[in-house]
């Protein structure tokens, strides 16, 4: 439910070499004498790669492999890296304390990167994802009640029923099951039922294809100085995909309006439509449409991407899969997950948390523009500095996560060493923290538990580990297929 800054192919191998030396050491880390470092004078910039005349070669490098390129610059120059890309001064920040300082303590000095907002607004309109200032606060206040922990607990029976219906369509055996597509359909159906009280049904495959097309178009547009009109011949696919998604949302909206208000279900769509009827100037139907689009796209994509990588981790690590399944069988005792039992699935939750460390759905947060001068650590940055926040580099940093390439769910156990604040941010932090994080964690835990009740996951013979690709969210470069088989009789009894 967060979104990335830019896109490109991800070199996980490059990121895994990240036993980083920091030449721009965080001033919040006290030295031996406990003395704070001196501030650099205004106008001084942190170290960074040579930019050449325009710095556009840096942009080209990022367009080829964004995360791998940023990881290399971090190794060479430290946790605060200056990129001079005319006309921009961009600063890449990968120190947890400084990232948290920006997103929490200095959030009011930052606005979201204009180019990213222009690209996303083509799909999301002027929703809470796009808005700033008072408009953002009003929209978030309107949306938040549906995503608080207590309302989310009430969704658990619906989530479990939806997951059960979806999993009933899976075959008992398949040596090459398209698990990524199946999990995406499941996530779409859950968000449709919880937010709009309807099923995705036959629209799932068409909607999935449309989302992929829109994501690919966004990838290209992040690196272009301006957007060509959608009626240009090479953008017809994007226009058709937008029409599919807009039609999906508009059908929900108008079907609800055709029903008397006293018959409306208690869901997000009804809440937004009541705001429209109470104040149509502030909440025109287009505003309702925009919020519904963001709820659908952000609401399913983070879950689908994370469950896809979780399924890979389970298949690639049979011992962890067996431990998680044993816990599911012990805790649920033949029942479907409930709000009460979900909290007891601690090891299963750790497998999801470790998956989000290794493969955060949004590995780079939307960049922030300083609206005024910002003092950050030892540096004093002028207004209009652009801050890039690649959280995946922190998630793969051996200083915070020893052996970062290893899948180790015990990192998140109760007895594990504390993770530095700001080092683990799968949902972001600060006032802009992901609105749907409670719903996402609940949905993923319920779905994962029910998968393990029914299916054993394994890697097909000869299959290489999937390569990650950043298309707004982090997905396998090629659609993930895994082998599935029925679980043991004890686990099957739990699923019945």
Language-model features and meaning:
Residues 19-21, 25-46, 112-120, 135, ...:
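Cytochrome P450 heme-thiolate monooxygenase catalytic core
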Residues 302-321, 325-327, 438-453:
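Cytochrome P450 catalytic-core helices
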Residues 47-52, 156, 160, 209-213, ...:
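Cytochrome P450 I-helix active-site segment
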Residues 138, 293, 298, 336-340, ...:
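Cytochrome P450 heme-thiolate "Cys pocket" and heme-binding signature region
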Residues 373, 389-416:
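Conserved cytochrome P450 K-helix/beta-meander segment immediately N-terminal to the heme-binding cysteine loop
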Residues 4, 14-37, 74, 163, ...:
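Cytochrome P450 proximal C-terminal region
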Residues 16-138, 153, 157-165, 201-202, ...:
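N-terminal membrane-proximal hinge/A-helix region immediately C-terminal to the signal-anchor transmembrane segment
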Residues 2, 8-11:
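Intrinsically disordered, low-complexity segments enriched in small polar residues
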């Amino acid at each position: 439910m967060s979104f990335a800054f830019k896109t490109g192919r991800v070199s996980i191998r490059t990121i895994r070499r990240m036993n980083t030396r920091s030449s721009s050491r965080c001033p919040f880390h006290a030295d031996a004498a406990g003395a704070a470092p001196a501030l650099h004078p205004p106008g001084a910039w942190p170290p960074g790669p040579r930019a050449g005349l325009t710095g556009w070669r840096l942009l080209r490098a990022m367009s080829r492999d964004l995360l791998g390129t940023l990881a290399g610059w971090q190794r060479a120059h430290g946790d605060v890296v200056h990129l001079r890309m005319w006309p921009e001064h961009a600063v890449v920040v990968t120190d947890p304390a400084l990232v948290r300082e920006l997103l929490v303590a200095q959030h009011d000095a930052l606005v979201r990167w204009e180019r990213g907002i222009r690209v996303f607004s083509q799909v999301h309109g002027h929703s809470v994802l796009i808005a700033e200032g008072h408009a953002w606060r009003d929209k978030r206040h309107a949306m938040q009640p549906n995503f608080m922990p207590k309302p989310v607990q009430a969704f658990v029976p619906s989530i479990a029923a939806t997951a059960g219906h979806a999993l009933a369509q899976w075959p008992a055996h398949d040596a090459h099951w398209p698990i990524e597509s199946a999990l995406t359909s499941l996530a779409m159906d859950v968000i449709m039922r919880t937010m709009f009280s309807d099923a995705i049904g036959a629209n799932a495959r068409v909607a999935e294809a449309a989302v992929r097309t829109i994501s690919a178009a966004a990838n290209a547009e992040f690196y272009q100085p301006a957007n060509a009109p959608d009626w240009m011949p090479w953008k017809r696919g994007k226009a058709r995909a937008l029409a599919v998604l807009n039609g999906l949302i508009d059908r929900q909206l108008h079907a609800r309006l055709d029903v008397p208000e006293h018959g409306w279900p208690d869901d997000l769509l009804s809440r937004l439509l009541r705001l429209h009827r109470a104040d149509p100037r502030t909440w025109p139907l287009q505003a309702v449409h925009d919020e519904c689009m963001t709820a659908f796209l952000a609401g399913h994509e983070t879950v689908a991407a994370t469950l896809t990588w979780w399924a890979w981790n389970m298949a690639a690590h049979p011992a962890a899969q067996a431990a998680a399944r044993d816990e599911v069988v012990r805790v649920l005792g033949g029942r479907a997950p409930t709000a009460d039992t979900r909290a007891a699935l601690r090891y299963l939750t750790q497998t999801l948390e470790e998956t989000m460390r290794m493969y955060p759905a949004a590995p780079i947060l939307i960049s922030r523009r300083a609206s005024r001068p910002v003092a950050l650590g030892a540096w004093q940055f002028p207004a209009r500095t652009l801050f890039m926040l690649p959280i995946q580099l922190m998630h793969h940093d051996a200083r915070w996560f020893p052996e970062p390439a290893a899948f180790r769910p015990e990192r998140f156990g109760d007895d594990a060493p504390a993770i530095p604040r700001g080092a683990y941010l799968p949902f972001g932090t600060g006032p802009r923290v992901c609105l749907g994080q409670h719903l996402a964690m609940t949905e993923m835990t319920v779905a994962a538990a029910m998968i393990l009740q029914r299916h054993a996951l394994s890697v097909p013979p000869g299959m290489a580990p999937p390569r990650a690709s950043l298309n707004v969210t982090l997905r396998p470069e090629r659609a993930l297929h895994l082998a599935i088989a029925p679980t043991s009789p004890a686990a099957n009894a739990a699923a019945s």
